[in-house]
């Protein structure tokens, strides 16, 4: 095993430069007093096929940009396993996916509010409790301008598809005949129906969450980005002091103090004075928690 290099120290250590990680790096580094480290196992997102919309045919199942996970064989698939794409590149899945911009159902956020006991998670809207819709609008730059459902001036570009297909129009007409009604869009809190998806593009090119949140602030002197750095373990401290017991830590017996990672053939420990944030994806984050005890 390689030797452990001298420890680097930051205020916040973010594991995973996907959609959530890019946004968190943007917001946390907005305070110049915060030293922020963003860790990404993959490389930069400057490959031609990432930017071209059809390029997801070349980025998915490609180890340059994808973890290349596959599912277990399933009887419902005649024993086949299928590709389970997870981005391994700056921008994460937003750099390799089909660019579909689709919010959840309003009822999904009701479940979140019930689970947390916090009404701010409710969908919201005029004269209704909840902040989710308002936050979506704040983040968005919608091609049609601001309205009851969409915002303008935010970082996330939302456009309509640049082409229509006769076969899709025929499918929509057939769906209507069996009771699946055509709707204007999928982002108003009720996704039942058929419509063309909105897409995260700008002038016909992919607009990833790295384009939206990371690249515009990459010049900040208090923001450091490690690429080709594989997080191996969250470092823990068994001694949790009273002044550290806030929020989710109230009943914690152990505190995350840093991350051990593999970079350039060396094991590197990075320390977090304030918080370690796991944004390594639906597979990566649970895996890190498991190997960290």
Region locations from a protein language model:
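Conserved redox-cofactor binding core of oxidoreductases
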Residues: 116-256
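Short, solvent-exposed loop/turn and secondary-structure capping segments
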Residues: 26, 47-52, 99, 145-147, ...
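Active-site-proximal beta-strand/loop segments in catalytic clefts of secreted hydrolases
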Residues: 17, 39-42, 98-99, 161, ...
């Amino acid at each position: 095993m390689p030797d452990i290099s001298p420890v680097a120290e930051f205020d916040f250590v973010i594991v995973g430069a996907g959609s959530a990680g890019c946004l968190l790096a943007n917001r946390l580094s907005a305070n110049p007093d915060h030293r922020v480290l963003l860790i990404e196992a993959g490389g930069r997102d400057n490959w031609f096929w990432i930017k071209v919309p059809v390029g997801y045919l070349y980025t998915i199942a490609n180890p340059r940009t994808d973890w290349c996970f596959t599912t277990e064989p399933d009887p419902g698939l005649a024993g086949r396993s299928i590709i389970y794409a997870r981005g391994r590149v700056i921008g994460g899945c937003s750099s390799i996916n089909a660019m579909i911009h689709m919010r959840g159902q309003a009822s999904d956020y009701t479940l979140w509010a019930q689970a947390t006991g916090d009404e701010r998670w409710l969908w919201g809207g005029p004269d209704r409790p909840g902040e989710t819709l308002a936050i979506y609008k704040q983040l968005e730059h919608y091609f049609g301008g601001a309205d009851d459902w969409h915002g303008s001036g935010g970082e996330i570009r939302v456009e309509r598809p640049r082409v229509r297909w006769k076969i899709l129009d025929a499918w929509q007409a057939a769906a209507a005949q069996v009771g699946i009604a055509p709707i204007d869009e999928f982002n108003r809190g009720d996704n039942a129906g058929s419509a063309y998806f909105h897409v995260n593009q700008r002038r016909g090119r992919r607009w990833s969450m790295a384009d939206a949140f990371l690249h515009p602030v990459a010049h900040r002197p208090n923001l450091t980005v490690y690429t080709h750095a594989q997080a191996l373990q969250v470092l823990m401290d068994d001694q949790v002091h009273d002044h550290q017991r806030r929020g989710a830590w109230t009943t914690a017996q152990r505190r995350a103090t840093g991350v051990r990672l593999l970079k350039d053939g060396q094991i590197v420990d990075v320390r977090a004075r304030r918080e370690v944030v796991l944004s390594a994806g639906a597979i990566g984050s649970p895996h890190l928690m498991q190997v960290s005890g």
